[in-house]
UniProtKB/Swiss-Prot annotation:
Any Pfam family: S-AdoMet_synt_C
GO CC field: cytosol
Residues that coordinate or bind ATP: H19, D185, A186, K187, R255, F256, D264, R270, K271, A287, K291
Binding site for L-methionine: E60, Q104, D264, K295
Keywords: ATP-binding, Cytoplasm, Magnesium, Metal-binding, Nucleotide-binding, One-carbon metabolism, Potassium, Transferase
Protein name stated in the entry: S-adenosylmethionine synthase
Reaction(s) catalysed by this chain's protein: L-methionine + ATP + H2O = S-adenosyl-L-methionine + phosphate + diphosphate
Length: 408
């Protein structure tokens, strides 16, 4: 890589489904899914803490007909991730589950049920088609970002895509028995070096790979390193991105037998960069897991990705960052902007016009367009919320219309 006249490094990390923070996310989203399965309009905001021998679930819920067995849901989630033995220090059967869930604040509920705009409308105005999605207000204030880039087929930044691939591969090899000594907790980090910005670089390589994986007590670090180099890295990292200068740090701290909630306390919402774009772009600060789609922290971040991805898929830019901001209790965003980093085939101002014409970022409209009141969230909890075709916000169904409108 020394031949590069300019060297720019881009690093992203991923953590496995058994990482304590990700386990907390998975529990929270499993509870959310069960409420939505029983009652799609449930309001849910659930946080989870996991530590040695204990899980604590707290939050606010509003549901009229749903009756969720929280204890059962938590234990089933822990079982699915792989904490099945008491000697892990945390397991599905014997760990305690403490529940402190109460009803959603009626003041917040009122502002979400009927937005400020809706309350100010006459009955005649409420019947107009353009106001159909104005009834529901945003569940909180805040700013959310969505991003897309043409550096990978899934229109995601390369470093985070590679890092997620490594942790997903570790889970596959653990679950299929190929590497039986692997345990649920793991992390991976990938540093990519380029001779310029992602959209202008002509040379790209992987500079550094870091893998830290929990393991049984009876395996050597030499064996782990050999298996990572044989079974994990080649299955994920394209050979053309590796060279003789690529560095590999495999369990650089040494033994990693004590892991998961027994090694570190986990909390919902602590891996927001892992969940999104790996640090490639700004983050508004709001976490996703455990929140129903009236919470714009989640739904608007998904929608911003949807908008950005369609812009890039339409060929209107090589990179697109979309920012949406809200006021609590109001339906319409207070602001929406796009930044294409100078890669647009039309101006950012033109893209603003196209977004206004082809997208609707009111919370109720987002929920309807992406069909978000479904039990689809537990599967988002690990390996990133973006770049995965199974999710509705990854559709590029508006790209052609955007392209045609831009040419018109």
């Amino acid at each position: 890589m020394s031949k590069f006249a300019v060297r720019k490094f881009y690093t992203s990390e991923s953590v496995s489904e058994g990482h304590p923070d990700k386990l907390s996310d998975f529990i929270s989203d499993s509870i959310l899914d069960e409420f939505l399965r029983q009652e799609p309009t449930s309001r849910v905001a659930v946080e989870t803490l996991v530590t040695t021998g204990m899980a604590v679930v707290a939050g606010e819920v509003r549901a009229h007909t749903a009756h969720v067995d929280i204890q059962k849901t938590v234990r089933e989630a822990v079982q699915r991730v792989g904490y099945t033995r008491a000697n892990y220090g945390f397991d599905a059967e014997y760990s305690a589950v403490l529940v402190a869930i109460h009803e959603q604040s009626p003041e917040i509920a009122s502002g979400v049920d009927h937005s400020e705009e809706w309350r100010e409308m006459s009955e005649a105005e409420r019947q107009k088609p353009e106001n159909a999605y104005s009834m529901v207000g945003a569940g909180d204030q805040g700013l959310m970002f969505g991003y897309a880039t043409d550096e990978t087929p899934e229109l995601m930044p390369l470093p985070i895509s590679l890092a997620h691939g490594l942790t997903r591969r570790l889970a596959e090899l653990r679950k299929d028995g190929t590497l039986p000594y692997l345990r649920p907790d793991a992390k991976a980090q990938v540093t990519v070096v380029r001779n310029g910005e992602p959209h202008s670089a002509t040379e790209t390589a992987v500079d550094t790979i870091v893998i830290s994986t929990q393991h049984s007590d009876d395996v050597t670090q030499e064996q782990i390193r050999a298996d990572m180099l044989e079974h994990v890295i080649p299955a994920v990292i394209p050979a053309e991105l590796l060279n003789e200068q690529t560095r590999y740090f495999i369990n650089p701290s040494g033994r990693f037998v004590i892991g998961g909630p027994h090694g570190d306390t986990g909390l919902t919402g602590r891996k927001i960069i892992v969940d999104t774009y790996g640090g490639a772009v700004p983050h508004g600060g709001g976490a996703f897991s455990g929140k129903d789609p009236t919470k714009v922290d989640r739904s608007a971040a998904y929608y911003a990705r949807y908008v950005a991805k369609n812009i890039v898929a339409a060929g209107l830019a090589r990179r697109a960052l979309v920012e949406i901001a809200y006021a609590i209790g109001r339906a319409h965003p207070v602001s929406l902007r796009v930044d294409t980093y100078g890669t647009g085939t039309v101006s950012d101002e033109k893209l603003d016009e196209l977004i206004a014409a082809h997208f609707d970022a009111r919370p109720q409209a987002i929920i309807a367009q992406l069909d978000l009141q479904r039990p689809i969230y537990a599967q988002t909890a690990a390996y990133g919320h973006f770049g995965r075709p199974e999710f509705p916000w990854e559709q590029t169904d508006r790209a052609q219309a955007l392209k045609e409108a831009a040419q018109g």
